[in-house]
From Swiss-Prot:
It catalyses: 7,8-dihydroneopterin 3'-triphosphate + H2O = 6-carboxy-5,6,7,8-tetrahydropterin + triphosphate + acetaldehyde + 2 H(+). This is 6-carboxy-5,6,7,8-tetrahydropterin synthase. Pfam families: PTPS. The keyword Lyase applies. Its EC number is 4.1.2.50. It comes from Helicobacter pylori (strain J99 / ATCC 700824). The lineage of its organism: Bacteria, Pseudomonadati, Campylobacterota, Epsilonproteobacteria, Campylobacterales.
Length: 200
């Protein structure tokens, strides 16, 4: 059984080294759509794989952190990086080039960590993020699958510190330790209470 939730964010970037000069040489933006697919081996007490409302919490917070921000590769020139940091309140510094494929791998990596560190209380089954799709436009998307995180090439692109968020982004988190919890060694960080009204 698989469920899907759609998230959206708007952002600007530059994709270096690609064949399209418009993308490789200019700051430009996209209205991104991120589809997150979660797989389970059984349904919970509400006959749900996972309540969609629960996917509007930590996962939503993480994806919203990329919204209305400039994303830049840490291989950009120091001058360019300083300009962004001095003139943008919201920015995300990334250790990977900013293709849709890289975003798909990155979101899969961090959303998997969030789900693994989440404690649910409604008799949920074994949950996993089976894939993530990232649409830059209506015409195409990149999709990353859980098995990709075992591929040495793909695995080398994403790690705990492959993104860092500006203070302007962090200031809107309800929990100032939100990102630290995602990448920490703690196994249980995000707790979700049992629904109040239960029919046996």
């Amino acid at each position: 059984m698989v469920i899907r939730r759609l998230y959206k964010f708007c952002a600007s970037h530059v994709v270096r080294n690609c064949s399209s000069l418009k993308c490789a040489q200019n700051i430009h933006g996209h209205n991104y759509e991120v589809e997150v697919f979660i797989e389970t081996n059984r349904l919970d007490n509400a006959n749900m794989a996972l309540d969609f409302g629960l996917m509007q919490q930590e996962m939503q917070t993480f994806i919203d952190s990329f919204d209305h921000a400039h994303h830049f590769w840490d291989k950009e020139s120091p001058e360019f990086q300083r300009f962004i940091e001095n003139h943008c309140v919201r920015y995300v510094k990334c250790s990977f080039n900013l293709s849709a494929e890289s975003y798909a791998l990155m979101f899969l990596y961090y959303l998997t960590k969030i789900l693994q560190k989440s404690v649910f209380s409604n008799n949920e089954g074994e949950l996993k993020v089976s894939s993530v799709r990232v649409h830059e436009t209506k015409n195409g998307y990149a999709e990353s699958f859980l098995k990709d995180l075992e591929n040495p090439h793909f695995k080398s692109l994403v790690h705990d510190h492959c993104v860092s968020f500006s203070q302007g982004i962090q200031s809107l988190w309800h929990d100032k330790d939100f990102f630290h919890k995602i990448i920490s060694d703690e196994k249980q960080c995000f707790f979700h209470a049992k629904p109040l009204h239960q029919i046996p």
